[in-house]
Each structure stands twice: as structure tokens, then as C-alpha cells.
């Protein structure tokens, strides 16, 4: 084999090796491109999912915050409504108190009321010795009302009572426009067993009891029946 043939054969072998190398390089490049594309797709998908989750998380937080804000606004509105309603109820009480303060103006009618209040106290206390405390301005009416109540108690119950009107202690005076201290619209406080048992039977205390009992009715009159209430007395 001469040099020409040897060189030709070497060139052929070189070309074969180069072609094999090129094919291998192309194969590696193709595989690398495929892997890169696959990895890029995987990363993109993961990032996409991550972004979606972050968005959903933020969206949920926004929705939760919206609900919290709405709930706060509703609570504020409810409190405002309740405040207005309570103010209306207080106005009702004030009007009732104004009328209550005028009851003692009619002396005959007021004396009958005093007698009935004292008699009720006798029945409630059910004691043999009772002390009555009233307003200083009612002193004259109180003596007569106490005597009449004791007589009625003896007639109805069949027992005599040792009753006295306190001449040293008095209930607060009636309401006046130029007076801001404690007031009492009238009535009495009865006590027995040296003050250990007390029956508060003032007009003011009776108004409080009536108001507590009638508050549901007053609310209904002012605002209508509650849609959430299932039971009624």
C-alpha cells in the first residue's frame, strides 16, 4: 500500500471519526435541548403553580379582610342603632318620670297612693313592728296614710301593727328644675327588725319595676316585633 492509499485511508478514518463525533455532539445537544426544555417547562409550571397559590392565598386574605371589615361595619351599625334605641327608651323613662313627679300634686289622690303603698309593704314584710320613711314634704299626708293602712291591714289580715313614721330620716325631695341632687317622686320605704328587712316601695322603684317588665313591649311599640325572636311571653 503506497502513501497515497495510506493517506486516503487515514482521511477516511478521520472523516468517520469526525462524523461520529459530530453525530454524538448533535445527539448530546439534542438531548441537552430536550432536557433544558423539559426542565424549563417544569420550572415554569412550578413557578406558575407557586404564583397561583400565592395569588389565591392573597385573594383569600383579601376576602377574609373584607369580611372582617364588613363585620366591623355591621357591628358599628348595630351599636349605633342600639345606642339610638336606648336613647329612645331613656327618653320614654324621662317622660314617665316627669309625669310621675306630678302625681303628688293631687294631694287626695296621692294620699290614697301612699296608703296603698304602705299597706303593700305591711303585707310583704309581715312583721309586727314596722318603721316608715317618706319625703319630708309628705309628712302630713304620710301620718294619715300610715294610720289608714294599719287599719286596713288589721281589718283584712286580722293583726295589729306597731308602726311609726320616721321623723329624723327622710327620702330625697321631689324633682325640681333648679335642683340637681338626688330626688324621689314619692312613696315610702318600710323596714323591720331594726332595718334588717327593707321594702322599697317608692314611686321611682315601682317605675323601675314596671319599666323592666314592660321593656320588651315598649321595644315592640317603638321598633316593631323582632324578626329573630321565636318565643313571646
From Swiss-Prot:
Keywords annotated in UniProt: Hydrogen ion transport, Ion transport, Transport
InterPro entries in UniProt: ATPase_E_C (IPR038495), ATPase_V1_Esu (IPR002842)
Stretches of the chain forming a coiled coil according to its record: none
Lineage top rank: taxon: Eukaryota
GO MF terms held by the record: protein-containing complex binding; proton-transporting ATPase activity, rotational mechanism
Keyword Ion transport in record: yes
GO cellular component, one term: proton-transporting two-sector ATPase complex, catalytic domain
Family: Belongs to the V-ATPase E subunit family.
Primary role: Subunit of the peripheral V1 complex of vacuolar ATPase essential for assembly or catalytic function. V-ATPase is responsible for acidifying a variety of intracellular compartments in eukaryotic cells.
Self-association state and partner proteins as the record states: V-ATPase is a heteromultimeric enzyme composed of a peripheral catalytic V1 complex (components A to H) attached to an integral membrane V0 proton pore complex (components: a, c, c', c'' and d).
Designated name of the protein: V-type proton ATPase subunit E
Gene label: vatE
Amino acid at each position: 500500500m503506497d502513501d497515497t492509499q495510506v493517506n486516503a485511508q487515514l482521511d477516511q478514518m478521520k472523516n468517520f471519526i469526525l462524523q461520529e463525533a459530530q453525530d454524538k455532539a448533535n445527539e448530546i445537544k439534542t438531548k441537552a435541548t430536550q432536557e433544558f426544555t423539559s426542565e424549563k417547562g417544569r420550572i415554569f409550571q412550578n413557578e406558575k403553580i407557586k404564583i397561583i397559590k400565592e395569588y389565591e392565598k392573597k385573594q383569600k386574605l383579601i376576602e377574609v379582610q373584607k369580611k372582617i371589615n364588613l363585620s366591623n361595619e355591621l357591628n358599628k351599625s348595630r351599636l349605633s342603632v342600639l345606642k339610638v334605641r336606648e336613647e329612645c327608651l331613656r327618653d320614654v323613662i324621662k317622660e314617665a318620670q316627669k309625669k310621675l313627679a306630678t302625681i303628688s300634686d293631687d294631694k287626695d289622690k296621692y294620699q290614697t297612693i301612699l296608703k296603698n303603698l304602705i299597706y303593700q309593704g305591711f303585707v310583704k314584710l309581715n312583721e309586727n313592728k314596722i318603721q316608715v320613711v317618706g319625703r319630708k314634704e309628705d309628712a302630713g299626708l304620710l301620718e294619715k296614710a300610715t294610720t289608714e293602712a294599719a287599719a286596713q291591714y288589721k281589718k283584712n289580715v286580722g293583726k295589729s301593727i306597731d308602726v311609726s313614721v320616721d321623723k329624723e330620716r327622710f327620702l330625697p325631695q321631689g324633682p325640681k328644675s333648679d335642683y340637681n341632687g338626688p330626688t324621689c317622686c314619692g312613696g315610702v320605704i318600710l323596714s323591720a327588725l331594726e332595718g334588717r328587712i327593707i321594702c322599697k316601695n317608692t314611686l321611682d322603684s315601682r317605675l323601675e319595676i314596671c319599666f323592666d317588665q314592660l321593656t320588651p313591649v315598649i321595644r315592640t311599640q317603638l321598633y316593631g316585633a323582632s324578626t329573630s325572636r321565636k318565643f313571646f311571653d
